[in-house]
Amino acid sequence: MSSELMFNYTFSWPAGPKDVILTGTFDDWRGTLPLVKTAKGNFEITMPVKLXNKDDTFQFKFIVDGVWCVSDSYKKEHVSEGIENNFLQITDLVETQEVXGASRIPEAGGLLCGKPPRSAGPPSTSNRKKNKRNNKKRKSKLKKKSTKNNKKSNESXDDNEEEDXVTGTTTEDVTGTSREETPLAEPTNVSKEAPGNFHILPIDQSADTTQSNGIIGGPGPVLVPNPGEIKEFTEIRDVDARELNERLNKKEEVPEPVAGPIVESSVTEKSPALPQADDPIVETKEMAHNVQELTPQVEAVTPLINELEPLPTPEAQISIPESSKVEPVEGSLQSKLVEKRESTEGVSDGSKKVENKAKKDEEVFTLDPIVNKAPKLPLTDEQTAEGRKSPAVSEEKEKKKKQEKGSKEVKRSETSKEKKPSAKEVKKQTVKAPKKQTASPLSSSTEEPKKKKTGFFGKLKKLFK
């Protein structure tokens, strides 16, 4: 082990110069440690001083504003002619040590690490007064909430405070702790104990501490005082689940009550109220009888409607009023039926005639070299009416068409000169005189003729009439 001694020492220089540097054997006289200027104006620095043994010395010197000089406040030593240094011995270093129990930090060059030096004098009274006030407030609160044991602990705390006031120390604990709230053990004679031995308090195992908390949900297990009296701890049963379920299900099966006689009694009780519903049944039968009486009248009208179907020529139309001289049965009803029937029949006849006309007007295309053909003039209303009146007219037209085909070559020059009719002329020719409204034989004479809306089918009927 090394026998080196290390001490912290503060080097100082009075105020006045600008810069002060400390140098010596610790840095081989290189002047590497400047002193720090304090608020007072002087220069100081604290550094560890190492000594190889008790007889060894620490030599140093100051460089003030670039001038090497020696301080009069330290011991001086002449090393050689004209050279003088300051030095420190072990006695000088020991006198200046502050705290003997302070630890040193080797990484910091042996600097002290411990409590700061305590200032001399009695302890401050202001802190003691504050602590006493806080302790009194705390005690007053604890007295209200504590039990008898807590009251004893408060009395012991008062005794401790009186002792603190005599010795000059104060209790730092302000808040209540478990030590103060727990009951204190009986005091023992301290004088009998040896100075080096520690006093161990006796353990008071009372019944309250040994027994666990009996409240369910509290800390620790619940220990029942009479476990032998509880059946759950002693009785053990072996139960088969299937047998138990079958036995319980058999017991639960209950015969359902018969609902037959109850329903019959309810029907018999409600039977006297049923005759009220027989009245509308009689009325419906009477209505059905009236409807059956009206059916022959409607059947008498149907053959008349069937007779009106064939309307190919105007001769048939003229013969209708002669054969339909029948007294109207409920005129308004029959007239509506006839009018509806006429509208459908006329459309069907017109569609047939249009198909026949389209077949007749089809041109016969051949392979002849004839190019120009005579244009077909639109048929007038008179020509169409004549074609409808008799089938002989249609035969004559076919003969004329054959003659025209033979004489087409002769009429080429004539047809080229002729002009085609304009669209206005065609429209004028197609315009027809309004048809006179004739009163239907089945409708009542008193009714005025109704104006019908001319639709697509109405226009077709006008073309074929």
UniProtKB/Swiss-Prot annotation:
PTM summary: Cleaved in the vicinity of position 160 to give an X-DNA-binding N-terminal subpeptide and a non-DNA-binding C-terminal subpeptide.
UniProt xrefs under Pfam families: AMPK1_CBM
Phosphoserine, modified sites: 153, 156, 271, 319, 343, 394, 440
List of residues that carry Phosphothreonine: 182, 295, 366
Organism: Saccharomyces cerevisiae (strain FostersB) (Baker's yeast)
Biased composition range(s): Low complexity: 166-177
Encoding gene per record: CRP1
Biased composition annotated in UniProt, kind: Basic residues: 127-151, 451-465
Region of interest called X-DNA-binding, as start-end residue ranges on this chain: 160-161
Domain of life (superkingdom): Eukaryota
Single GO molecular function: DNA binding
Name of protein: Cruciform DNA-recognizing protein 1
